[in-house]
Amino acid sequence: MEKKRILVIDDDESIRKLMAHMLELEGYQVDTAATGNEAIQKTKSNFYNLAIIDIRLPDMEGTALLTLMQDTVPKIVKIILTGYPALNNAIDAVNKGADGYITKPIIDNAGFLRKIKDHLRKQDESNRYNEEKVAEFVESRIKQLDAKDV
């Protein structure tokens, strides 16, 4: 099975390294970015299953990056990471396309990893469902075309 790819976007190098290390130990392939623009460039040239996005980046707000990513890579799972755990931040992030919301510092490593795994599992289920629906449509269409040829 192919490794899931995760992009960690945070201007704090120690947080990027810590998250990358934790996720790599779980078997994920991890890439990092320090700015929103760097993240956008990486998503243009690489495929990622999931992005963890700090809410405050040096060149843009994490919620602005959410909107950009929603337009350029809509299928990527987007999780906002924040040291500012306020309800209005969570609501704003979800309204702009976040699939999840994690507060830092991350105290419960197992809980953090479980959230990542759950989001990736849901993504897999959604992809399988979509593939099944496409296959059903193609099969149905072939039968319709075959019936016309008879």
Q: What role is predicted for each listed range?
A:
Residues 4, 35, 61-64, 85:
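Acidic catalytic/metal-coordinating carboxylates
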Residues 16, 58, 82:
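The feature encodes the CheY-like receiver
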Residues 17-25:
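Charged docking surfaces used in two-component/phosphorelay signaling
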Residues 41, 63-75:
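Short amphipathic alpha-helix used as the core "switch/output" element in two-component signaling
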Residues 54:
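Active-site residues of response regulator receiver
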Residues 121-150:
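CheY-like receiver
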